[in-house]
């Protein structure tokens, strides 16, 4: 093993000098004598390599010895990782002893070839009305939850995990990328209480960790998911939050000497996103269904980071601050959310017609809002008054109590089957429930519950 020494330290970026005939390759893992792991990013010439620290660089000094491991970072994979919490290097952080893995895989892998890839049109039922109706998920597809700060990305993701992981008997991998430690803790206990912890591998690189950890932790989680997929399983891969992955790249990019591009992001933004997203795919042996939370800075969907993510997804679920301010949760915007699966050939004609009917009614209501604000409801035609009444019922019926939010509001969560969702909205559009007051539709599960409520009013 070649040995070098540290010659420069700037934050998370460290330069190491090696003998000219033993310069490490890009992505090789280096070990500092203090125990810190570095990953080679650039070769600067003269035997010097520039690395990112996968851990804090506090206490390092020039002249410390560094050993080249001659291989990239490797992490444990396989069933031994289930029920465990690990860091970016695959080391356990749950104080439950060693992982005891039988195999380790490198975190840098090629995406499956074009011939190996497979696509599926099988739907994945989530039990969340607005998602199943407007932006249905495909098994083996990629889903993005877009939203600004505090509109409910993590709660939506936890509900999806709870519903899908309980209904779906396969394995899941959760990568916490630059999120709050508190959320990681909540998530762990949620999984434990739902008795699905033994089917989930948890990998965390939290907000308080150096950018190197946050940049690589998504790849660590993905590698574990790929192993399950290559064994012929259908695996769920959850990432919270993709934006922090981009941000970690931005933090180290300037230190690596790259010129910033639009809005100060790294010039390699699209490539870094592509490297991660192209690996999250389904093959002929197994599938990876991924759900990714995407933070939207300042609620601006045209920001380069969320805009780059959009291109890779099959379904986009957009959370809206306006809907959250009305007290309607989940605060999903039915006019902004899209899915490639919403096609009569995939979901069937009835589902397609109901979904488009709901969007058409809500869009008409949106257009009428200006007239209502200036002239009032009385100036509308009878037809328009009916559209407004139905749209307001639809808006409220799109809300639903979540199981994971039960601890906060004491309202029992509801899982609504897709058939019930379609039946309910079809009835509202057909005018079957015009006699029911709109407040009966708020935070209800199925349409039968609404009718029952209305009878008690």
UniProtKB/Swiss-Prot annotation:
**GO MF entries:** ATP binding; ATP hydrolysis activity; proton-transporting ATP synthase activity, rotational mechanism
What GO cellular-component annotations does this UniProt entry give? plasma membrane; proton-transporting ATP synthase complex
Q: What EC number(s) does the entry state?
A: 7.1.2.2
- PROSITE patterns, alphabetized: ATPASE_ALPHA_BETA
Q: What UniProt keywords are attached to this protein's entry?
A: ATP synthesis, ATP-binding, Cell inner membrane, Cell membrane, CF(1), Hydrogen ion transport, Ion transport, Membrane, Nucleotide-binding, Translocase, Transport
What catalytic activity is recorded?
ATP + H2O + 4 H(+)(in) = ADP + phosphate + 5 H(+)(out)
InterPro entries documented for this protein: AAA+_ATPase (IPR003593), ATP-synt_VA_C (IPR055190), ATP_synth_F1_bsu (IPR005722), ATPase_a/bsu_AS (IPR020003), ATPase_alpha/beta_chains (IPR050053), ATPase_F1/V1/A1_a/bsu_N (IPR004100), ATPase_F1/V1/A1_a/bsu_N_sf (IPR036121), ATPase_F1/V1/A1_a/bsu_nucl-bd (IPR000194)
Q: What is its main location?
A: membrane
Name the Pfam families on file: ATP-synt_ab, ATP-synt_ab_N, ATP-synt_VA_C
Annotated membrane topology = Peripheral membrane protein
Please state where this protein is localized.
Cell inner membrane
Q: Which residues bind ATP?
A: 147-154
- Record's SUPFAM superfamilies? C-terminal domain of alpha and beta subunits of F1 ATP synthase (SSF47917), N-terminal domain of alpha and beta subunits of F1 ATP synthase (SSF50615), P-loop containing nucleoside triphosphate hydrolases (SSF52540)
**According to its UniProt record, which protein family does this protein belong to?**
Belongs to the ATPase alpha/beta chains family.
What is the documented function of this protein?
Answer: Produces ATP from ADP in the presence of a proton gradient across the membrane. The catalytic sites are hosted primarily by the beta subunits.
* PANTHER family per UniProt: ATP SYNTHASE, ATP SYNTHASE SUBUNIT BETA, MITOCHONDRIAL
Q: How does it assemble?
A: F-type ATPases have 2 components, CF(1) - the catalytic core - and CF(0) - the membrane proton channel. CF(1) has five subunits: alpha(3), beta(3), gamma(1), delta(1), epsilon(1). CF(0) has three main subunits: a(1), b(2) and c(9-12). The alpha and beta chains form an alternating ring which encloses part of the gamma chain. CF(1) is attached to CF(0) by a central stalk formed by the gamma and epsilon chains, while a peripheral stalk is formed by the delta and b chains.
UniProt-recorded name of the protein? ATP synthase subunit beta
Query: What is the organism of origin for this protein?
Result: Glaesserella parasuis serovar 5 (strain SH0165) (Haemophilus parasuis)
Q: Which gene encodes it?
A: atpD
